[in-house]
């Protein structure tokens, strides 16, 4: 499913057998309304309000099975990389439920329309992975949601100079340990929908999302593909306000983030692909480090985060369908 224009959506599926198409404002087919019957061409176009986020349901006319789909990324006016982790294939032939697990970039410049759209998600928890300095520079405009952050210095990400993915991504495994434990604790309490974010919504959030999807049994190739979507869906101009480093003395992140929206009006740099020159996704450096240090992702989840077989079974019961 994709938005081909602000007011136009297209649904696509591979099976040519007839399906009924239903639409609802929540991921619950029982409450959805029929919009098209016995569509057999594998595609269906329909109008959509610019900022509504409907859910659609394909009901197979042969066996009445239902597949839920939605837009992966929220169509925000001034947000960045805010997307749903639903719909991915997971353990035991199931899929990740839509509308419960979100990932995002920072949200300091949301419009009022954006705030209303995010409020409609019914978030029960936000896990903010940003440093203390980043949160000072760009406070979130999302209100009314329990907000969890763990203070640390931005310098911890680049303690010896320029960030390199080969060393920086493995280092983030330890850096994010407290936040990851809080994320899984919230999910095991069924405190969802939950949104996890950092500044760009790609590096720290990419690692956290990869670990969460791994716990749900999502295949590695799908996890990496989701990670790489950030290049397409980021809008750096909305991740930070215009910053004058002189206004933030002692803030070690101010100079770096000043380029997001330079005070002198220069263009905001475009996102760059999250891979090395030879095509290696940066995320794989973190995943390889986990497997080297703990033997496997399951070993890491159990011994480091306390998410053993029983906890993974509960997560899959609650967040898969």
In which residue ranges do the predicted regions lie?
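Cys-dependent protein tyrosine phosphatase-like superfamily
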Residues: 1-194, 208-321
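Ser/Thr-glycine-rich phosphate-binding loops at phosphate-binding pockets of nucleotides
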Residues: 200, 204-205
């Amino acid at each position: 499913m994709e938005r081909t224009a602000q007011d136009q959506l297209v649904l696509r599926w591979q099976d040519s057998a007839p399906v009924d198409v239903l639409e609802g404002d929540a991921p619950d087919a029982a409450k959805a309304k029929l919009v098209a019957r016995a569509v057999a061409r594998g595609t269906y176009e329909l109008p959509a309000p610019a900022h509504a986020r409907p859910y659609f349901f394909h009901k197979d006319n042969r066996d009445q099975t239902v597949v839920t789909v939605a837009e992966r990324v929220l169509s925000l006016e001034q947000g960045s990389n805010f997307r749903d982790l639903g719909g991915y294939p997971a353990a035991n032939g199931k899929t990740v439920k839509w509308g419960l697990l979100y990932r995002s970039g920072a949200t300091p410049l949301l419009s009022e329309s954006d705030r209303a759209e995010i409020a409609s998600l019914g978030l029960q928890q936000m896990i903010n992975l940003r440093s203390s300095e980043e949160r000072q520079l760009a406070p979130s405009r999302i209100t009314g949601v329990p907000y969890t952050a763990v203070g640390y210095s931005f310098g911890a990400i680049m303690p010896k100079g320029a960030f390199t993915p080969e060393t920086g991504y493995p280092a983030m495994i330890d850096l994010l340990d407290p936040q990851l434990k809080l994320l899984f604790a919230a999910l095991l309490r069924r405190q969802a929908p939950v949104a996890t974010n950092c500044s760009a919504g790609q590096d720290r959030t990419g690692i956290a999302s990869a670990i969460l999807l791994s716990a749900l049994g999502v295949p590695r190739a799908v996890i990496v593909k989701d990670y790489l979507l950030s290049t397409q869906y980021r809008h750096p101009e909305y991740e930070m306000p215009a910053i004058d480093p002189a206004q933030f003395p002692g803030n070690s992140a101010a100079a770096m983030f000043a380029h997001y929206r330079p005070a002198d009006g220069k263009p905001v740099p475009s996102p760059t692909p999250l891979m090395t020159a030879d095509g290696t996704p940066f995320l794989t450096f973190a995943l390889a480090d986990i497997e080297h240090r703990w033997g496997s992702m399951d070993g890491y989840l159990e011994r480091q985060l306390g998410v053993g077989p029983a906890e993974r079974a509960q997560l899959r019961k609650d967040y898969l369908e």
